[in-house]
Swiss-Prot record:
Lineage of the organism: Bacteria, Bacillati, Actinomycetota, Actinomycetes, Micrococcales
Name of this protein: Heat-inducible transcription repressor HrcA
Similarity annotation: Belongs to the HrcA family.
Entries under SUPFAM superfamilies matching the protein: GAF domain-like, Winged helix' DNA-binding domain
Record InterPro entries: GAF-like_dom_sf (IPR029016), HrcA (IPR002571), HrcA_C (IPR021153), WH-like_DNA-bd_sf (IPR036388), WH_DNA-bd_sf (IPR036390), WHTH_transcript_rep_HrcA_IDD (IPR023120)
PANTHER family attached to this UniProt entry: HEAT-INDUCIBLE TRANSCRIPTION REPRESSOR HRCA
Lipid metabolism listed as a keyword: no
Function recorded in the entry: Negative regulator of class I heat shock genes (grpE-dnaK-dnaJ and groELS operons). Prevents heat-shock induction of these operons.
GO biological process: negative regulation of DNA-templated transcription
HAMAP family: HrcA
GO MF term set: DNA binding
Keywords, ordered alphabetically: Repressor, Stress response, Transcription, Transcription regulation
Keyword Disulfide bond assigned: no
Source organism of the structure: Kocuria rhizophila (strain ATCC 9341 / DSM 348 / NBRC 103217 / DC2201)
Chain's gene name: hrcA
A Pfam family matched in the record: HrcA
Length: 337
């Protein structure tokens, strides 16, 4: 939009509506924002904004509210994000540094982001490119069952119980573990299935069945795709905004619960020069999140995984964008340590 005054008026309408949830009239705009023009001039500009599809009159109200297109213009006009306060930054750092493993980091991150933004927060587990095998442990749990434990450099421990035709004694178990480690230690997770293939044929007869079962378990554990997992927090926050979803909040909650929709959307979102991506309402597609907005950004190596929030289109975009970006940066730093 090239008209500076209309941009200013649109910005004021968005800010007032987000704050009050009440349609905004020309007189209120002039008084509240001390605009150096008359109410009649503002009404003319509002008529032009409405004709452009940026604001709309709900029902018979004399005031106007932003449309999805109006929010988009508003968001695109945000030149720089306001940094968080020193207290907020310290709180994020302390909160995340208290985590003891990857699962705890993920849980803490979404809880923190939900608290900061008062929206529903989501985080995608880190993509595993470059993650290698740190250790493999085999534990005899009795009754011919062995617990196969895979410990990758990402810190997320995975385990799987396998039943053996014959139990192994301690010496056999140690030998099998040594053979397995010789194959996979330091290997990337993607290569583990190929590295354990054929292992059983190289083992002594007494270990072949166990070697085959352990190899199968390791292949499954290594192939388990953490990047297709989401952690969520703050969905109860959406209930406070149920009136902001014209049809029903149910499709939004179902999309969050189903995860597939969220993962597909997050993977398609590309952050801009400000370091965030914003999807507003139905501007791109008609899906279960067509009445919601999503603010997300990448974190970790190459910003390949996403973290963000979901809320109504009537959202405090500048504050939300700044919070999402800040949390992602601290998260990247935490995981890189």
């Amino acid at each position: 939009m090239e008209n500076p005054r209309r941009v200013q008026i649109l910005r004021a309408i968005v800010e007032d509506y987000v704050h009050s949830r009440e349609p905004v009239g020309s007189k209120a705009l002039v008084e509240r924002h001390r605009l150096p023009v008359s109410s009649a001039t503002v009404r003319n500009d509002m008529a032009a904004l409405e004709e452009a599809g940026l604001i709309v009159a709900p029902h018979t109200s004399s005031g106007r509210i932003p449309t999805d297109r109006g929010y988009r213009v508003f968001v695109d006009q945000i030149a720089a994000l306001q940094p968080l306060t020193g207290a907020q930054r310290r709180a994020i750092q302390v909160f995340l540094e208290g985590a003891h493993d990857l699962d705890d980091v993920m849980e803490r991150t979404v809880r923190l982001l939900a608290q900061l933004t008062h929206q529903a927060a989501v985080i995608q587990y880190p993509v595993r490119a470059g993650i290698t095998v740190r250790h493999v442990e085999l534990v005899d749990v009795g009754a011919g069952t062995v617990l196969v434990i895979l410990i990758p450099t990402s810190g997320r421990v995975a385990q799987r119980a396998v039943e053996l035709a014959e139990p192994l004694d301690e010496v056999q178990l140690l030998e099998l573990r040594a053979r397995v480690l010789a194959r996979v230690l330091g290997s990337t997770l993607e290569t583990v299935p190929g590295r354990v293939a054929g292992l059983a044929e190289e083992l002594p007869e007494a270990l072949r069945h166990a070697g085959d079962r352990v190899s199968e378990a390791l292949a499954v554990l290594a192939a388990a795709s953490d990047e297709h997992r989401l952690v969520m927090a703050g969905t109860a926050n959406l209930a406070r905004f149920s009136g902001d979803f014209p049809q029903s909040i149910s499709p939004v909650l179902e999309a969050l619960e189903e995860q597939v929709t969220m993962l597909r959307l997050l993977s398609a979102m590309q952050q801009d020069e400000r370091g965030v991506a914003v999807r507003i309402g139905s501007e791109e597609c008609d899906d279960p999140l067509a009445e919601a907005s999503v603010v997300a950004t990448g974190y970790g190596p190459h910003a390949a995984s996403k973290v963000g929030v979901v809320g109504p289109t009537r959202m405090d975009y500048p504050t939300t964008m700044a919070a999402v970006r800040a949390v992602a940066r601290y998260l990247s730093r935490n995981l890189g340590d």
